[in-house]
Amino acid sequence: MEALALAQGKPPTAANIRSVAEAVSPEDAAWAFTQWELRERARAKFPDAERMLFTREALEQATPAAIARYHASMFPHGALVADLTAGIGGDLMALAERGPVVAFESDEERAVYAEWNAGLPARRDDAMAAEWQWEYAFCDPSRRRAGRRLSEPEDFSPNPVEVARRMSGLRLGGIKLSPMLSDAFLRNLGDSIEFVSHRGECVEALIWIGTEAKPGRYAVQIAAGGAVSRLDASQTLPARRDAAAFVFDADPSAVRAHALGALCAEHGLHPLADSVGYLTGEQAAASPWLRGYRVLADAPARERAVREAARRLAARVAEVKSRVPDTQRFGWVARVVEGERRVTAVLYPRERSVRVLLAEPLDAGR
């Protein structure tokens, strides 16, 4: 770790790298400067990133600390949990906070880093080839190979279909996957599916399997501080309608989980025309699941019509939100300036046409 100490706080210039290399070795110097670069990038995921070790690829897939704590919270306190894919230890650290863990990581470098980061031993063998002597397990199949993101689940390591089959005999097993995978594929793995959002993005799909899994489909929102909110996706959507006094952009996990019916029922909202993810209603609604806007104008997506609406408001478009395909063809919307009042342009589909709302965020000025 001498190289890390020597490289700390120094920009990775040729002179600095050469200076550190003279004290250790060129390989150790390059490794140390890479670690400090990765530690800086990892700060968004891990509060204690400055003490951790990373590989570039493993950091990309590593679970942020707030989400890892949610994963760990699903397992009983004090029960043994197997981390089948420890990586550099993102989930392993959170699992260890709540009880005993057995960790598997077949990649030697990642296993060493996981041990450093979590302070626990990691078995170097393949978890899928081991005899399972636990009732709880978590798996985050690798979705990258040689720096390339894999899109086909059968290429993941381990194969999530095989993991789900093995987990069916447990009390509870969790599999972390991409939220971009199809509903049909996810349903084939298990009956309890969660779509998780963090910092405004839907970041993962979680499949829970076993006798303690709660069947259903859910949206889960994890705040930066770790607070957790859940929506049940069992409620149906009400009838669609045109724009009312307010429009709301729903959290992406609620959209992906098909859980907008719960938000409509709670706040008296309706889907906006033919959009997926925009809701509308006559009253303002306060919810961590919704970002609200006061509708000022509703115009067809033609430049003359939108500019005329903006002129009546003496407004300029400061932000563009869109849930229509091929948004780039409406690039002119961002250049609409007909005054100083800052508004948000919301593009949405209605039947075969596209319309533009000019609206003000309800949280503007806070």
Label the model's feature ranges.
Residues M1-R366:
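SAM-dependent transferase fold signal centered on methyltransferase-like domains
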